[in-house]
Amino acid sequence: AALMIQGADSSTLAQNTHCIEIVEQGLLVEPGSFVLDIKQAGPYFQKQGALGFINSFVKNALPGMKHPISGVVDVLELIYNTHPQDNFGLSLAVSHDTILAAIIAVISGRNTVSQEDWPRMMEGLFVWFEGDEFLESKLKWIWRGELNELSIREFQKLEK
Protein backbone atom coordinates (compact mmCIF):
# COMPACT_ATOMS: atom_id res chain seq x y z
CA ALA A 1 0.00 0.00 0.00
CA ALA A 2 2.83 2.40 0.85
CA LEU A 3 4.42 1.84 -2.57
CA MET A 4 1.08 2.46 -4.28
CA ILE A 5 0.80 5.81 -2.49
CA GLN A 6 4.40 6.69 -3.30
CA GLY A 7 3.84 5.90 -6.97
CA ALA A 8 0.68 8.01 -7.10
CA ASP A 9 2.45 10.92 -5.40
CA SER A 10 5.36 10.81 -7.84
CA SER A 11 3.08 11.01 -10.89
CA THR A 12 2.40 14.73 -10.40
CA LEU A 13 4.56 17.79 -9.88
CA ALA A 14 1.97 19.44 -7.62
CA GLN A 15 2.45 19.29 -3.87
CA ASN A 16 0.08 16.76 -2.31
CA THR A 17 -1.78 17.88 0.78
CA HIS A 18 -3.35 14.57 1.74
CA CYS A 19 -2.54 12.61 4.84
CA ILE A 20 -2.87 8.88 4.35
CA GLU A 21 -2.72 6.49 7.27
CA ILE A 22 -1.77 2.89 6.54
CA VAL A 23 -3.30 0.40 8.97
CA GLU A 24 -2.42 -3.27 8.64
CA GLN A 25 -5.29 -5.67 9.32
CA GLY A 26 -4.86 -9.43 9.63
CA LEU A 27 -8.26 -10.19 8.11
CA LEU A 28 -7.14 -8.96 4.69
CA VAL A 29 -3.95 -11.02 4.35
CA GLU A 30 -3.63 -14.74 3.76
CA PRO A 31 -4.83 -16.84 5.45
CA GLY A 32 -7.05 -13.96 6.54
CA SER A 33 -10.54 -14.05 7.93
CA PHE A 34 -11.49 -17.45 6.60
CA VAL A 35 -9.00 -19.86 8.18
CA LEU A 36 -9.50 -21.16 11.72
CA ASP A 37 -6.85 -23.90 11.64
CA ILE A 38 -4.09 -23.60 9.04
CA LYS A 39 -2.87 -27.13 9.78
CA GLN A 40 -6.23 -28.55 8.68
CA ALA A 41 -6.88 -26.18 5.77
CA GLY A 42 -3.33 -25.75 4.43
CA PRO A 43 -2.92 -29.17 2.78
CA TYR A 44 -6.11 -28.59 0.76
CA PHE A 45 -4.69 -25.35 -0.64
CA GLN A 46 -1.50 -27.15 -1.65
CA LYS A 47 -3.44 -30.02 -3.22
CA GLN A 48 -6.22 -28.04 -4.95
CA GLY A 49 -4.45 -24.80 -5.83
CA ALA A 50 -6.00 -21.38 -5.32
CA LEU A 51 -9.03 -21.82 -7.59
CA GLY A 52 -9.92 -25.29 -6.29
CA PHE A 53 -9.43 -24.18 -2.70
CA ILE A 54 -11.72 -21.16 -3.08
CA ASN A 55 -14.35 -23.31 -4.78
CA SER A 56 -14.24 -25.74 -1.86
CA PHE A 57 -14.38 -22.83 0.59
CA VAL A 58 -17.46 -21.17 -0.94
CA LYS A 59 -19.20 -24.56 -0.79
CA ASN A 60 -18.29 -24.76 2.92
CA ALA A 61 -16.48 -28.04 2.22
CA LEU A 62 -13.11 -27.51 3.94
CA PRO A 63 -11.99 -28.45 7.44
CA GLY A 64 -10.36 -25.74 9.52
CA MET A 65 -12.31 -22.93 7.86
CA LYS A 66 -15.04 -20.56 9.00
CA HIS A 67 -18.43 -20.74 7.36
CA PRO A 68 -18.04 -18.61 4.20
CA ILE A 69 -20.69 -16.10 5.26
CA SER A 70 -19.15 -15.70 8.72
CA GLY A 71 -15.70 -15.07 7.25
CA VAL A 72 -17.01 -12.55 4.74
CA VAL A 73 -19.12 -10.75 7.36
CA ASP A 74 -15.99 -10.35 9.50
CA VAL A 75 -14.19 -8.63 6.60
CA LEU A 76 -17.20 -6.47 5.76
CA GLU A 77 -17.55 -5.39 9.38
CA LEU A 78 -13.87 -4.42 9.44
CA ILE A 79 -14.36 -2.31 6.32
CA TYR A 80 -17.54 -0.75 7.75
CA ASN A 81 -15.85 0.13 11.06
CA THR A 82 -12.67 1.57 9.54
CA HIS A 83 -14.33 3.80 6.95
CA PRO A 84 -13.73 7.53 7.56
CA GLN A 85 -16.66 9.24 9.23
CA ASP A 86 -16.65 12.40 7.10
CA ASN A 87 -18.66 12.57 3.88
CA PHE A 88 -15.57 12.87 1.70
CA GLY A 89 -13.57 9.98 3.14
CA LEU A 90 -12.38 6.96 1.21
CA SER A 91 -10.81 3.75 2.45
CA LEU A 92 -8.61 1.59 0.28
CA ALA A 93 -8.35 -2.01 1.43
CA VAL A 94 -5.61 -4.02 -0.26
CA SER A 95 -5.85 -7.81 -0.15
CA HIS A 96 -5.08 -10.97 -2.12
CA ASP A 97 -6.90 -12.26 -5.18
CA THR A 98 -7.95 -15.38 -3.27
CA ILE A 99 -9.66 -13.35 -0.56
CA LEU A 100 -11.29 -11.03 -3.08
CA ALA A 101 -12.53 -13.98 -5.18
CA ALA A 102 -14.08 -15.58 -2.10
CA ILE A 103 -15.76 -12.36 -0.95
CA ILE A 104 -17.23 -11.65 -4.39
CA ALA A 105 -18.56 -15.20 -4.78
CA VAL A 106 -20.11 -15.29 -1.31
CA ILE A 107 -21.80 -11.87 -1.43
CA SER A 108 -23.04 -12.67 -4.95
CA GLY A 109 -24.62 -15.92 -3.73
CA ARG A 110 -22.47 -18.12 -5.94
CA ASN A 111 -20.91 -21.41 -4.86
CA THR A 112 -18.64 -21.75 -7.88
CA VAL A 113 -15.76 -19.56 -9.03
CA SER A 114 -14.43 -19.97 -12.57
CA GLN A 115 -11.13 -18.76 -13.98
CA GLU A 116 -13.08 -15.96 -15.70
CA ASP A 117 -14.48 -14.87 -12.32
CA TRP A 118 -10.99 -14.63 -10.81
CA PRO A 119 -9.85 -11.06 -10.05
CA ARG A 120 -7.22 -9.79 -12.46
CA MET A 121 -4.03 -8.05 -11.38
CA MET A 122 -4.94 -4.79 -9.59
CA GLU A 123 -8.67 -5.31 -10.20
CA GLY A 124 -10.80 -3.98 -7.41
CA LEU A 125 -14.18 -4.26 -5.79
CA PHE A 126 -15.92 -1.00 -4.86
CA VAL A 127 -18.04 -1.31 -1.70
CA TRP A 128 -20.00 1.05 0.49
CA PHE A 129 -22.64 0.77 3.16
CA GLU A 130 -25.90 2.56 3.80
CA GLY A 131 -26.97 2.61 7.43
CA ASP A 132 -25.79 3.79 10.82
CA GLU A 133 -25.21 0.33 12.31
CA PHE A 134 -23.36 -2.48 10.57
CA LEU A 135 -25.92 -5.24 11.25
CA GLU A 136 -28.76 -3.02 10.05
CA SER A 137 -26.90 -1.67 7.03
CA LYS A 138 -27.17 -2.41 3.36
CA LEU A 139 -23.99 -3.43 1.54
CA LYS A 140 -23.68 -2.04 -1.96
CA TRP A 141 -20.92 -3.04 -4.34
CA ILE A 142 -19.76 -2.62 -7.89
CA TRP A 143 -17.87 -5.48 -9.49
CA ARG A 144 -16.91 -5.28 -13.16
CA GLY A 145 -19.38 -2.48 -13.79
CA GLU A 146 -22.38 -4.19 -12.18
CA LEU A 147 -24.11 -2.66 -9.15
CA ASN A 148 -25.39 -5.09 -6.48
CA GLU A 149 -26.71 -4.85 -2.94
CA LEU A 150 -27.71 -6.96 0.02
CA SER A 151 -28.98 -6.52 3.56
CA ILE A 152 -26.30 -7.49 6.09
CA ARG A 153 -28.98 -8.83 8.46
CA GLU A 154 -30.57 -11.02 5.76
CA PHE A 155 -27.14 -12.13 4.51
CA GLN A 156 -26.16 -13.34 7.99
CA LYS A 157 -29.37 -15.36 8.24
CA LEU A 158 -28.26 -17.41 5.21
CA GLU A 159 -25.50 -18.95 7.35
CA LYS A 160 -27.94 -20.80 9.57
Feature annotation, model-predicted:
Residues A1-K160:
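Terminal low-complexity/intrinsically disordered segments and their adjoining alpha-helical capping regions
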